Amino acid sequence: MTVCRVASEAELRLDGDLVFIGKTDEEYSLVCSTVCSGTQSVGQTVEREDGWRCFRIRGVLDFSLIGILAKISAILAENRIGIFVVSTFNTDYVLVKAENFDRAMGLLAAAGYSVTE
């Protein structure tokens, strides 16, 4: 996976299975497959960071649930694994650097979490 800062939302494409576009008053961001990153942003990329892998919390998360992501991030932080998180209406997607992915999955499984790539 790739995380990009892009110049504008113009011509950003939603091709691919996992694409997130973020817009604030300060920036536009794109998260997508590294393979697709060149075609997703069509020359709009200002800065990018490759080498992420993604897992999601299995199941639909009710908005009344509290602390799920905080607990997951605490487990990973205690083991010095940085995260980048994006969310949809149904669930959260956690990105970790590829070299930490297997260890992160093992730590979360040992803590009883059901996550899927």
What residue ranges belong to the model's regions?
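A generic structural motif
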Residues: 28-32, 91-97
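A short glycine-rich beta-strand->turn/loop micro-motif centered on a GG-aromatic cluster
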Residues: 82-90
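Short low-complexity, flexible loop/linker segments enriched in glycine and/or proline
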Residues: 99-101
